[in-house]
Amino acid sequence: MRKTVNTTDKMNFLRKIVRNCKDEDDQKPPLASTLPNDDDLWLPPPEYVPLTEITGKKNMRNLCINGEVKVCSPNGYSFRILRHILESLDEIYSGNHRMIGLVKVVMDLTLSGAPCPEGMNWVYKLRRTLIFQWAESRGPLDGEELEYSQEITWDDDSEFVGLQIRVSARQCHIQGRIWCINMNSRACQLWSDMSLKTQQSEDHKNSSLLLE
């Protein structure tokens, strides 16, 4: 993979188009690593089963969540590219690392929904109150909030895909729902792509705690 160079009128035109779907920011967004040839789908191991039951309130947070993932690509996009970009998140994540596990969960739940067209962009949104539980000594501090925003791009000679990611999380008193999803769903595959770190609960074999 290499950064494209504006050597032809066609590429100049493409750059002008792409510029419209990027935030105005002087800092160059990070690039995803080289795309592998093998893109076989596989189901994640059992530890990726999300929380199904909570018996205690230790290290538990009830959070009002807003998630948005905007996909920009002049020629359309495939989930193969999106999955590969998400595999690089640990290396290029710029937000609060005590809440990176929450960000992964929210991004994947967001991308599991139906996108809405917005110009050349496809926008996935999630607004929900959810319950999260972390393993001991992990997760956000009491009362800590999250405002995370980052742009990540895939750019080579033939294709440009940009992701604009926004996730906010605020602790609230509204009763949330436990985050859960079908094991065969797209979100569960994305969790494994992003190496979501969990730990099986000692109390309940079907419950998992976030480790990040």
UniProtKB/Swiss-Prot annotation:
Function comment: Plays a major role in assembly and budding of virion. Completely covers the ribonucleoprotein coil and keep it in condensed bullet-shaped form. Inhibits viral transcription and stimulates replication. Plays a major role in early induction of TRAIL-mediated apoptosis in infected neurons.
Short sequence motif named PPXY motif, residue ranges: 45-48
Taxonomy, superkingdom: Viruses
Recorded name of the encoding gene: M
Quaternary assembly: Homomultimer. Interacts with nucleoprotein and with the cytoplasmic domain of glycoprotein.
Family assignment from sequence similarity: Belongs to the lyssavirus matrix protein family.
Name this polypeptide is given: Matrix protein
GO molecular function: structural constituent of virion
GO terms classed as biological process: viral budding via host ESCRT complex
Pfam families, A to Z: Rhabdo_M2
Membrane topology reported for the UniProt record: Peripheral membrane protein
Comment block on domains: Late-budding domains (L domains) are short sequence motifs essential for viral particle budding. They recruit proteins of the host ESCRT machinery (Endosomal Sorting Complex Required for Transport) or ESCRT-associated proteins. Matrix protein contains one L domain: a PPXY motif which potentially interacts with the WW domain 3 of NEDD4 E3 ubiquitin ligase (Potential).
Keywords for the protein's UniProt record, in alphabetical order: Host membrane, Host-virus interaction, Membrane, Phosphoprotein, Viral budding, Viral budding via the host ESCRT complexes, Viral envelope protein, Viral matrix protein, Viral release from host cell, Virion
Additional information: Most abundant protein in the virion.
